[in-house]
Design a protein with these regions (language model features):
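Short gly/pro/ser/thr-enriched loop/turn and capping motifs at secondary-structure boundaries
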Residues: 37-38, 58-59, 110-114
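Conserved strand-to-helix beginnings and helix N-cap segments that scaffold or border functional pockets
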Residues: 16-17, 62, 86-90
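Glycine-rich, highly charged phosphate/nucleotide-binding loops
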Residues: 54-66
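General beta-strand structural signal in soluble alpha/beta enzymes
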Residues: 30-33, 52, 76-80, 103-108, ...
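Generic beta-sheet signal
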Residues: 1-5, 71-79, 83
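Class I SAM-dependent methyltransferase SAM-binding "motif I" and its flanking Rossmann-like core
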Residues: 11, 82-127
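Glycine-rich, flexible N-terminal cofactor/catalytic loop recognition
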Residues: 1-55
Length: 129
């Protein structure tokens, strides 16, 4: 099973509780090292295999996932923000579907929501400013 986890808007403590628990229980984590706060990897167990996808092709990422899935390992694909808004997961999901690999999405705190919180107002208030 592959869990697409949204890492939140940058701070280690802005990941969702579900996302943190998925990281804690992961056997394999593939993260976007050029974008994701590396402090989030501190939630992983020492035995977890960690891959920085910043230096990997889509084919290499899918190969890691296929191998881990064939060994019944729990896999986290860690993306920035909320991966269901913008996380470049479509092409990965298409590949996973073609190999009958199960997946789900754990949303993260989006940057536009974090911006509203930092501004001390509601998101809809920002639209009217």
């Amino acid at each position: 099973m592959v869990h697409f986890v949204g890492a939140g808007s940058g701070a280690k403590d802005l990941i969702t509780v579900r996302g943190m628990n998925l990281l804690k229980n992961a056997d394999v984590i593939i993260y976007a090292g050029s974008l994701v706060n590396p402090e989030l990897l501190e939630y992983a167990e020492d035995s977890c295999e960690i891959y920085n996808s910043a230096y990997m092709t889509l084919e290499e990422i899918i190969d890691v996932i296929k191998t881990a899935d064939s060994e019944n390992k729990d896999i986290v694909r860690l993306h920035t923000g909320d991966s269901s808004i913008y996380g470049a997961i479509r092409e990965q999901i298409e590949q996973l579907n073609s190999y009958d690999i199960s997946w789900d999405i754990c949303p993260g705190v989006s940057s536009f929501l974090a911006a509203a919180a930092a501004a001390g107002c509601e998101y809809l208030s920002l639209i009217h400013i």
